[in-house]
Amino acid sequence: MAQKPTSTGPSQRQQRVAELVRHALAEVLQRGDIQDPVLGTHVVTVPEVRMSPDLKLATAYVMPLGGLDEAPVIAALERHRKVLRQAVARRVNLKFAPELRFRRDETFDEAARIDRLLRDERVQRDLDSAPEDDEPETGTGH
């Protein structure tokens, strides 16, 4: 009997469906199909969607361009969750239309935090004083 792989990451199918859902959501938001005052005044990006293993739940990570306050945008998306789910169902051929959940995309914040850490004076000092192991040794050395 074949055993399931023990990897904990998303399967290839989850990744493929997540990308299809991401494209569908991005298209609906870009076209302005949802009539909402908040969504009408914000350009919303969908950098990532994660699917549950059974493909019945899609978590969309969203971020308004320009770093504007994302709370009203997420609230507006939640209000229109049903319409967005129907729009995704029309664009993505699945047995079940996934339930949509919206979360704030924190990758930019995490990247900024790492950048601040790397620019920290103590880290710079450590990086500058690190031994350079990459230089080739000269000599016959055995």
UniProtKB/Swiss-Prot annotation:
InterPro entries documented for this protein: KH_dom-like_a/b (IPR015946), RbfA (IPR000238), RbfA_dom_sf (IPR023799), Ribosome-bd_factorA_CS (IPR020053)
From start to end residue, where is composition biased (Acidic residues)? 129-142
Q: Taxonomically, what lineage is the organism?
A: Bacteria, Pseudomonadati, Pseudomonadota, Alphaproteobacteria, Hyphomicrobiales
Where it mainly occurs, coarsely classed, is cytoplasm
GO function terms (MF aspect): ribosomal small subunit binding
* Name used for this protein in its record: Ribosome-binding factor A
Q: Write down the superkingdom of origin.
A: Bacteria
Which Pfam families does its entry note?
RBFA
From the UniProt entry, list the residue stretches annotated as the region Disordered.
Answer: 123-142
Where is it located? Cytoplasm
NCBIfam families under this entry? PRK00521.2-5, rbfA
Which species is this UniProt entry from?
A: Methylobacterium radiotolerans (strain ATCC 27329 / DSM 1819 / JCM 2831 / NBRC 15690 / NCIMB 10815 / 0-1)
